[in-house]
């Protein structure tokens, strides 16, 4: 792929020179900012604190402000905001007062997609991995796509890149219904689950109808690629009045996986496609959920004319995405080592998928899990599901809920989760007070051969690298970006 190339700005946005991002360090914002920089626009942005992301953008020429102030918008032709930013933000308030357009990030993404062959990946779970797989397979096929992903693609070292072809591959975010701005030519729906329900006023039917509306943004000649194994996707399938291609383990799927076998990080399977020879593939990720993500990729790649050789190469050479079952390395313990894994999963279905992947790839190993729930509202709404799935670990340490800006909700916290899991009789979880150093707590619980999984969408993302650097684990082996030990 071509990285950091400079191109001419899009002619349809010729009146726009400087684009300002409010919250530029966010995972959904920085990728769009990087693509716009590489298209030749002036980009500025603000965030509450600096990070590796803002430093990277600054190295490409973006002007970065720490803190939100009215004067940051001077010279901006448009402001791009995420759903987390409201009109009380001083930069937004100033822009509105000066009649500077303020647009959601999805609207800017839609503008980038407008004159390209857009491929949008939607669904409650698996968006980031599926989008990354499609980008990797297209690159292996020589198509050099532009991509905007909600996670760091390890092979590229970034979550966004400007390619030279007509393809733009991006995640479609249902959390705030902003994916309705997008008008792709191909859309994927991986699954539909109860999450971010405040956006849909707690009405699951409204969520389902919104997904149908998203698919009807496709032109009549577009393509909806849908996972037929998901019961809700299967339910809305008859309502979709666009060409469809289904995938899954089901015998009725257009693109189907059989003979699935897992060996540690590697998953092998055979793909059946109508009017084609069976295709044997492997992917460097564990779990049936990643087989489904791969099938969505194969469906689109096949439809776009990518060769089978490129599909096999792109999947087998895939180096993963940051915080999606990311192997950080091995920690030394008495008698051997423990494999250290970090994962972003924060919904019971995602937690279950990862636990099943561990059981499938390493059936003889214990799973020691450090989990941090994300949002009090999610913990409340899915409380019983969390109790059930978290009890499947062999050893469980529960960090306090990461609030993500929410106020505490009575009963929807980790102390209560611990109590409920203990009451089930399957497990005796350990509650971790906020601010407690974890390495001294974790080490005595570990045995040689264990898998230590740190999981959640909050600041637990910093735990795995901290453990690797802890003096208590001196001599730890660090994995490469491919998840292999150096």
Swiss-Prot record:
Chief location bin: cytoplasm
Reactions it catalyzes: UDP-N-acetyl-alpha-D-muramate + L-alanine + ATP = UDP-N-acetyl-alpha-D-muramoyl-L-alanine + ADP + phosphate + H(+)
Pathway involvement of the protein, from the record: Cell wall biogenesis; peptidoglycan biosynthesis
InterPro entries for this protein: Mur-like_cat_sf, Mur_ligase_C, Mur_ligase_C_dom_sf, Mur_ligase_cen, Mur_ligase_N, MurCDEF_pg_biosynth, UDP-N-AcMur_Ala_ligase_MurC
Top-level lineage group: Bacteria
Binding annotation for ATP: 123-129
Pfam families named among the record's database cross-references: Mur_ligase, Mur_ligase_C, Mur_ligase_M
Entry-linked PANTHER family: UDP-N-ACETYLMURAMATE--L-ALANINE LIGASE, UDP-N-ACETYLMURAMATE--L-ALANINE LIGASE-RELATED
Record family assignment: Belongs to the MurCDEF family.
Task of the protein: Cell wall formation.
Protein's UniProt name: UDP-N-acetylmuramate--L-alanine ligase
């Amino acid at each position: 792929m071509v990285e950091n190339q400079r191109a001419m700005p899009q002619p349809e946005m010729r009146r726009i020179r400087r684009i300002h991002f409010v919250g530029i360090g966010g995972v959904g914002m920085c990728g769009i900012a990087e693509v716009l920089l590489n298209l030749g626009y002036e980009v500025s942005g603000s965030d509450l604190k600096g990070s590796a992301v803002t430093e990277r953008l600054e190295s490409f020429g973006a002007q970065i402000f720490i803190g939100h102030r009215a004067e940051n918008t001077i010279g901006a032709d448009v402001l791009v905001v995420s759903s987390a930013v409201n009109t009380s933000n001083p930069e937004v308030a100033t822009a509105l007062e000066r009649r500077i357009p303020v647009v959601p990030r999805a609207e800017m993404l839609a503008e980038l997609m407008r004159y390209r062959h857009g491929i949008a990946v939607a669904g409650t779970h698996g968006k980031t991995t599926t989008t990354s797989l499609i980008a990797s397979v297209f690159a292996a096929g020589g198509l050099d796509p532009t991509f905007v992903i909600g996670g760091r693609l390890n092979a590229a070292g970034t979550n966004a890149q400007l390619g030279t072809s007509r393809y733009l591959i991006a995640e479609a975010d249902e959390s705030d219904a902003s994916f309705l701005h997008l008008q792709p030519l191909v859309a994927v729906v991986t699954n539909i689950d109860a999450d971010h329900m405040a956006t849909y006023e707690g009405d699951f039917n409204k969520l389902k109808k919104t997904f149908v509306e998203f698919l009807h943004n496709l032109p009549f000649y577009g393509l909806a690629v849908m996972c037929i194994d998901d019961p809700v996707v299967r339910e809305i399938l008859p309502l979709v009045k666009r060409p469809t291609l289904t995938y899954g383990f089901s015998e009725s799927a257009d693109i189907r996986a059989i003979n699935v076998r897992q060996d540690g990080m590697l998953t092998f399977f055979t793909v059946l496609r109508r009017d084609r020879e069976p295709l044997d593939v492997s992917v460097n990720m564990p779990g049936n959920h990643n087989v489904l993500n791969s099938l969505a990729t194969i469906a689109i790649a096949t439809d776009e004319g990518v060769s089978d050789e490129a599909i096999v190469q792109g999947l087998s050479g895939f180096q993963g995405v940051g915080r999606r079952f990311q192997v950080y390395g091995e920690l030394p313990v008495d008698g051997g080592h423990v494999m250290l894994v970090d994962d972003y999963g924060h919904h019971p279905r995602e937690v279950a998928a990862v636990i099943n992947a561990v059981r499938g790839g390493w059936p003889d190993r214990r799973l020691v899990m450090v989990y941090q729930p994300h949002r009090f509202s999610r913990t409340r709404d899915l409380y019983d599901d969390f109790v059930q799935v978290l009890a499947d670990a062999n050893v469980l340490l529960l960090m306090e809920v990461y609030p993500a800006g929410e106020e505490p909700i009575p009963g929807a916290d980790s102390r209560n989760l611990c109590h409920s899991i203990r009451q089930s009789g399957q497990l005796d979880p350990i509650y971790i007070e906020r601010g407690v150093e974890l390495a001294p707590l974790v080490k005595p619980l570990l045995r040689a051969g264990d898998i230590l999984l740190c999981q959640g969408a909050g600041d637990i993302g910093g735990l795995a690298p901290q453990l690797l650097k802890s003096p208590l684990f001196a001599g730890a082996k660090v994995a490469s970006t491919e998840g292999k030990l150096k």
